[in-house]
Each structure stands twice: as structure tokens, then as C-alpha cells.
């Protein structure tokens, strides 16, 4: 759940992409260009300031076979994990064949590798479709909307819903957690607080899954993740409630004991001695 990897930050992302383009040019030559469309956390890092890191770069890669070797060489050079840049997300629910169409230009490196990212509404649509409680999906949604509002370019609910339909169709099955956030985020006037509480909830969910993995190795699966999180949250809330009740009962017991103690009603003289 928590990868033992060096994080990819806003500061080093462009450095890695620049080195990747150089390596690709060396292996591939200059005749066949390549295109990489940044998805997910990498797209957030490239375009926004509220998030500091990701652990891998999800992307759509349109390139010759030399790109695979270039990715591995750059990973070795910088001590990055195998697959630090990959297209594995194509196997997830948030993938759509239309993502290339809705991508926007970011940068070109070494005159051969063009980097693109996903336009804001469609990046939000992907995050809503993914809706993982234990990752950054939900807080990324709030963060993106928050930054667009601060910049004077707010994104409407209608534009996000149109983007979801455009990528996934009218009958798209959006996760329950995403639907709940969709209603809350566009009615909230306080994105800062909503971002903080959403991120705290994600970190708690991640912690609960790690705890479950330690207690029940090899039983965590995609289909039971949400129920495990909900069960863990319920137990924690009940534990907090029981702890609070226990403290109140103890306080009440001490107060009652004090009231019943004769010594509590006895006065003292000026030297601090009880009168006889």
C-alpha cells in the first residue's frame, strides 16, 4: 500500500523527462518523434501547486520500442524503481480511448519527445471515475477545483459532468465516494477546509489498509477494499466513543466520591490544620 520508493516531485519531474528525451534521441535517432501524455498524479504535479509528490508516472506512451529502454536507462541513472514511467493505468476504470483527444500541450524536450497533460475537466473526470479513498484521487479533485477558483477560472459542475460523459458514456458507474464528493465539493464555499479533511480521510484509509495487511496477509483485494475501510473507520469511531465515555464515567466517579467524602466538607484553620 505504501511503496518503498523515492518520490517524484514537482522539482525533479521535468529533470527526469528531459533526461528521458535525451536518452530516447540517442537510442532512436531523430526521424521518429514520440509523445507522452501525463495522467494522474504526474499531471497534477505538472499543472498545480497543492500536491508535492507522486511515486510513479502514469502515462499514455506513443513511441517506438526504444522508449522502453530509455525509460529503464533513466530509471537506473536516477535510482528510480522499475516502471517509474508506465502505461499500467490502461487496465483501470479511469482509462478512456478519448484521453489523447482531450490532452493539452505541456513541453517538448530535445526536439523529439512531446509531453502533454490532460485538460482540467477531463483530469477531474478521471479522478471521479477512479475515486480511491486510500490514494490522492478525492483530495486531488478538491485541490484542482480550489486552484482554479483562486486563479479566477472556476470549473463548473456541468463541465465536469460533461467530461465524465464524454470519456465514459452516459451510464458511467462512478464510485459512491466520488458521487458523495461531487455533491459536496460544488456546494462548498470552503475548499481549503474540505481539502484538508479529505486528505486526512485518505491518509486514515491508507493506514487502515496497511493495518489490515499486517493482520491478514494476502487477503486484501480490490473488491473488498471499501468494506475494509468502512469497517475499520467504524471500529475506530466506536473505540474513540468508548474511550470518551470511559473518561466521562471516571470523571463522574471522582466527583461523586469527592461529594461523599467527609473530609471534603471539613474546613481548615489558617495553619492548614483541620479543627478538632
Question: Which residues does each PLM region occupy?
Answer:
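Compositionally biased terminal segments of proteins
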Residues: 1-276
Amino acid at each position: 500500500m505504501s511503496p518503498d520508493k523515492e518520490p517524484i516531485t514537482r522539482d525533479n519531474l521535468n529533470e527526469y523527462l528531459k533526461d528521458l528525451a535525451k536518452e530516447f534521441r540517442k537510442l532512436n535517432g531523430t526521424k521518429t518523434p514520440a509523445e507522452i501524455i501525463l495522467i494522474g498524479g504526474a499531471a497534477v504535479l505538472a499543472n498545480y501547486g497543492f500536491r508535492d509528490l507522486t511515486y510513479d508516472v502514469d502515462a499514455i506512451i506513443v513511441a517506438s520500442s526504444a522508449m522502453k529502454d530509455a525509460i529503464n536507462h533513466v530509471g537506473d541513472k536516477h535510482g528510480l524503481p522499475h516502471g517509474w514511467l508506465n502505461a499500467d493505468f490502461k487496465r483501470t476504470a479511469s482509462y478512456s480511448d478519448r484521453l489523447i483527444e482531450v490532452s493539452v500541450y505541456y513541453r517538448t524536450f530535445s526536439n523529439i519527445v512531446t509531453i502533454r497533460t490532460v485538460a482540467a475537466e477531463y483530469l477531474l473526470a478521471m479522478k471521479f471515475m477512479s475515486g480511491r479513498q486510500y490514494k490522492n484521487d478525492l483530495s486531488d479533485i478538491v485541490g484542482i477545483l480550489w486552484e482554479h477558483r483562486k486563479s479566477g477560472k472556476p470549473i463548473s459542475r456541468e463541465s465536469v459532468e460533461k467530461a465524465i460523459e464524454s470519456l465514459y458514456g452516459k451510464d458511467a458507474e462512478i464510485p459512491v465516494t466520488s458521487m458523495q464528493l461531487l455533491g459536496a465539493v460544488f456546494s462548498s464555499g470552503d475548499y481549503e477546509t474540505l481539502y484538508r479533511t479529505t486528505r486526512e480521510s485518505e491518509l486514515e484509509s491508507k493506514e487502515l489498509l496497511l493495518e489490515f495487511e499486517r493482520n491478514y496477509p494476502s487477503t486484501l483485494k480490490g473488491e473488498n477494499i471499501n468494506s475494509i475501510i468502512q469497517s475499520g473507520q467504524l471500529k475506530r469511531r466506536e473505540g474513540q466513543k468508548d474511550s470518551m465515555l470511559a473518561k466521562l464515567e471516571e470523571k463522574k466517579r471522582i466527583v461523586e466520591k469527592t461529594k461523599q467524602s467527609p473530609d471534603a466538607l471539613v474546613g481548615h484553620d489558617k495553619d492548614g490544620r483541620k479543627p478538632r
